[in-house]
Amino acid sequence: MSDQQQPKQINFTILPDEDSTAPRTYANFCSIAHTPFDFTLTFCEVMPLSDKEIKEAEAEHVVRAPVRTKIVVPVQFVPNLIAALQEHWRVFSDS
């Protein structure tokens, strides 16, 4: 019986490979949904409402916002995302 080799662990940092043509998307609203397997973050842009849209919103109790992008991440990714957001928020708040 031969000894099985342990998988070699490699530590590395992932850096975004910035592509100057990659679109930058602005959003000021995020809706979140999840399944047992992933989280979906739907980013929208809410613009100031016209008088007509205000009346519709008052009647329907709904404001429609255009979806700019949807991002789906695995459940295992979410704790790291939360930790990164909290750290960046702490640095932002302390400055």
Describe the role of every protein-language-model region.
Residues S2-Q76, N80-S95:
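N-terminal intrinsically disordered, cationic/polar leader segments
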